[in-house]
Amino acid sequence: MEEGITRIGVSLPKNLLDEFDRIISTRGYSSRSEAIRDAIRTYITEYRWLESEKGEIVGVLVVLYDHHVKGVSDLLIDLQHDFHEIITSSTHIHLNEDQCLEMILVKGKMERIKVLVDKISAARGVMNVKLISAVKKV
């Protein structure tokens, strides 16, 4: 084993692993490990960007979630009320029988928006959260 490499074990739902394997095969990765390293690097880069942003921004928070997970819809509504001072509007889209997409337009201090992102990201049933910073307020 190469020095500096640590072997880990990860438990994943079968459907998630199957989809991941399909994608890495399509993209031509030589191994699952390399694809996981690439995914982790991407996650770290996005996290560092989120942490480095400061000041006032305008953007959209895109949230993909499984609405069958008990309480997730109510939690998202409650959070939007709790953060009403930075949320200008939201749009809810039913993607299929299981998944919904919420687009939340935000405007305000990045520090406050980060708190919202973290709370939504940690919610059970939320599958993906992406903050797209459209412009910095001048």
UniProtKB/Swiss-Prot annotation:
UniProt KW Transcription regulation keyword: yes
Example GO biological process: response to nickel cation
UniProt keyword terms in alphabetical order: DNA-binding, Metal-binding, Nickel, Transcription, Transcription regulation
Record-linked Pfam families: NikR_C, RHH_1
SUPFAM superfamilies: ACT-like, Ribbon-helix-helix
Positions contributing to Ni(2+) binding: 81, 92, 94, 100
Cofactor note: Binds 1 nickel ion per subunit.
Organism domain of life: Archaea
Molecular function via GO: DNA binding; DNA-binding transcription factor activity; nickel cation binding
Named cofactor requirement(s): Ni(2+)
Protein task: Transcriptional regulator.
Assembly information from the UniProt record: Homotetramer.
Stated family: Belongs to the transcriptional regulatory CopG/NikR family.
Protein name per UniProt: Putative nickel-responsive regulator
